[in-house]
Amino acid sequence: MIGRISGLLLEKFPPLVLVDVQGVGYEIDVPMSTFYNLPAVGTQITLHTHFVVREDAHLLFGFATEGERQAFRQLVKISGVGARTALALLSGLSVADLHQTVSNQDPARLIRIPGIGKKTAERLLLELRDKLDLGVSAIPGAAGARRPSTMGSDVLNALLSLGYNDREANWAVSQLSVDLSVSDGIRQALKFLSKEK
């Protein structure tokens, strides 16, 4: 129904962004891989979208690439994997990394992602085994490419494992410079969080 949104980026608060299109503000949930690569507020952006209609809500999910959206659509088709779980997977792994994880049948890599238990990881690997494309073909040079925001995902996972909630962890990661190492990113994020308390 809504396949793409182009407009002015008004607000960024992980994992939500607010995009103004002709005076209408759309709240869009995005994976952290997309969030980390967004331009500054006040800039024109285009997101590939997936629209979900539920009894209690209409939800819009946005992705920087068509490959991310295709992977999201494959993930939500799996029994027990909802939109939020699919978003968490794409926040913790790039599409290329997810493809590699499925190819290698590596459940340990999936279990590190918040909200993914052993049974869900095994079901994901089983059901995705025959659907290995996962949108990777839509990403130029994606065969083994790591997205630049892997550091952010690693820091996010570290903060969540230390007991910070999603909101705190995502906020702290959004404050980081993208050129930090993972260990420096964790140190800096912990400093941000200690100042907020």
Curated annotation (Swiss-Prot):
GO cellular component terms, semicolon-separated: cytoplasm; Holliday junction helicase complex; Holliday junction resolvase complex
Positions of region (Flexible linker): 143-153
Region (Domain II): 65-142
Gene Ontology biological process terms from the UniProt entry: DNA recombination; DNA repair
Region of interest (Domain III), ranges: 153-197
Localisation: Cytoplasm
Ranges where the record places region Domain I: 1-64
Pfam hit, one: HHH_5
Molecular-function GO terms, alphabetical: ATP binding; four-way junction DNA binding; four-way junction helicase activity
Major place of residence: cytoplasm
Entry keyword set: Cytoplasm, DNA damage, DNA recombination, DNA repair, DNA-binding
Subunit composition and interactions: Homotetramer. Forms an RuvA(8)-RuvB(12)-Holliday junction (HJ) complex. HJ DNA is sandwiched between 2 RuvA tetramers; dsDNA enters through RuvA and exits via RuvB. An RuvB hexamer assembles on each DNA strand where it exits the tetramer. Each RuvB hexamer is contacted by two RuvA subunits (via domain III) on 2 adjacent RuvB subunits; this complex drives branch migration. In the full resolvosome a probable DNA-RuvA(4)-RuvB(12)-RuvC(2) complex forms which resolves the HJ.
Protein purpose: The RuvA-RuvB-RuvC complex processes Holliday junction (HJ) DNA during genetic recombination and DNA repair, while the RuvA-RuvB complex plays an important role in the rescue of blocked DNA replication forks via replication fork reversal (RFR). RuvA specifically binds to HJ cruciform DNA, conferring on it an open structure. The RuvB hexamer acts as an ATP-dependent pump, pulling dsDNA into and through the RuvAB complex. HJ branch migration allows RuvC to scan DNA until it finds its consensus sequence, where it cleaves and resolves the cruciform DNA.
Swiss-Prot/TrEMBL domain comment: Has three domains with a flexible linker between the domains II and III and assumes an 'L' shape. Domain III is highly mobile and contacts RuvB.
Similarity annotation: Belongs to the RuvA family.
Name listed for the protein in its UniProt record: Holliday junction branch migration complex subunit RuvA
Organism: Nitrosospira multiformis (strain ATCC 25196 / NCIMB 11849 / C 71)
Lineage: Bacteria, Pseudomonadati, Pseudomonadota, Betaproteobacteria, Nitrosomonadales
